[in-house]
Amino acid sequence: IMSRYGDTPEGMVASCMEFLRICRDENFPDVVISIKASNTVVMVKTVRLLVRTMEAEDMYYPLHLGVTEAGDGEDGRIKSAVGIGALLSDGIGDTIRVSLSEDPEAEIPVARKLVDYILEREGHEPVETSPAPGYDPVTADRRHSRVTERIGGNFPPVVISDRSNGDFEFDHASQPDYIYIGKEDPENLPDNFRLLVDAHFWKERPNAYPFFIASEIDELKDYSVPLKFIRLTYRDLTDRVIEVLKQDKSVIVILSTHHRNGIAAERAAMHHLLAAGCDVPVILHRDYRETDIEALQLKAAIDFGTLLLDGFGDGIMLHNEGSETMVTDSCMFGILQATRTRISKTEYISCPSCGRTLYDLQTTIARIKKATSHLKGLKIGIMGCIVNGPGEMADADYGYVGAGKNRISLYKGKECVLKNILSLIHISEPTRPRLI
C-alpha cells in the first residue's frame, strides 16, 4: 500500500478497506471505524473518500471522528471543530472525541458544545440547490476566482475585521488585511489599514473602498474605484445579479447568511456561482452573538472551516457581539491556519497525554511554545510517548517525544536526531540553535 499510494488519504482508505473486507468475509459486522489525522485537510478528505468507497461496496459501518493530537487552547478547539464539524455537517459521523492537550475533563464540554451546535439545525427550512457539474467534495480543489486587487486567484484568503464599533486595538500577531468601519470615520481611525466604508458615506481617498448591500447593486456602476464590496445572500443571486458580478471586475462579494443551516445556504450560493460560470471573488461572512469565547471559536470554526475545506472562500469576515474584536481576529487567523489555507504562525501537534506519558506534558508544551512561537510556518510535534508519538506527528517538521521517565527524544522530520535525553533542558535556553 505504501509503495502504491504513499502516505496519502488514498493509502489510508486502501488499508482500512482491506480489514473491512476481511470482517465482511468472516461475517463480523461489529466494527466502528476511527480514521484520523492531525491535518484537518487530510482527515476530512480521508473520511469522505472512505464513505464513498464503503458505499460502493455496500458497506455502512459507523464512524468515529476526531482530529488527532489537536493541541491545546484556542488552536486545539478550532482545529477539532474544523475537522469534526465539516464531517458532521455532511451527515457523516456517529461518535466523536475532541483531543486536547489539557486535563481530560476539559474535552467533554467542548465535544458537547460542538455536537449541540450541529443539532441546532434540525428541522431547518430546506435549501434548494444542486451540486455544480464537475465538483468533487473529496478532492475539493479551490474554486477558481479572478484576481481583484490581490483578492482571489491563488492569493491566500484575506481577513476582514469588523471595527464598526470603534474598537481599534490590534494584536500584531493577528492583524487583519482590511477593516470595516461602517458609516463614519471615527477620530481614532488608524491610517495604515485598507478600509471598507458604507457606500453612501464613502469618500474617494487612498485605501478606502465602498461597501454596498444587495438593494444597492444598481449603484455599483456609479463608483469608479478598483475595488468594491457588496454583501449578498444566496437568495440575492438572481440571474441579473450574477450578470452584474460577471461584468464588473472590481466587485468582491461578501457572502452572508441568516439561515439556520448557514453552511448549506452558503454552499448552495457557491455552487450556484460555479454552475453560472461566475468567477467573482467571495468573502465568507458570519454574524454571532456569543459571550462564551469557546462557543464562538467552535461555531465559527465549523461554519467557516467547512466551506474552506470545500475549496470555497477568498477571505473571511467574522463579527461577534459579545467579545473584543481582537478575539474575533485571532479566531479568523486560527481557522485559516487549521484549514491550511493561510499559515500565519507556528503549528503545534500535541497529544492529550495518557499513562505512558512520563513527563509534565502541559508545562512542556507551554515552554516549547514560548521558545518557538515566532517560527511561522513550522510544525512541531510534542508527544507523550514513543508508542504512538512518531507516527501521529508524521506531519511535523520537528518532534519532541517521550522516551522514559523525564526523558525524551528529538526528531527532525521522521529521523531521530537525539535519543533519551533529559526533558526540558534543551529548551531552557531558547537561543541554542543546534536543537532547532
Give the role of each language-model region.
Residues I1-E18, S161-F170, Q175-I263:
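Active-site beta->alpha loop and helix N-cap motifs at the rims of alpha/beta catalytic domains
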Residues M2-T148, L227, L237-L375, K379-I382:
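Catalytic alpha/beta core domains of metabolic enzymes, predominantly
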Residues S89, I386-E392, A396-K412, C416:
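Nucleotide-binding motor/catalytic cores of P-loop/tubulin-like NTPases across gene-expression machines
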Residues G91, I151-G153, G311, T372-L375, ...:
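A structural signal for short secondary-structure junctions
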Residues R142-D167:
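N-terminal basic/disordered segments at the start of proteins
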Residues L418-L422:
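Short acidic-hydrophobic, aromatic-tinged amphipathic segments that line or gate anion-handling sites
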Residues I425-I436:
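Residue-level detector of conserved catalytic or cofactor/ligand-binding positions
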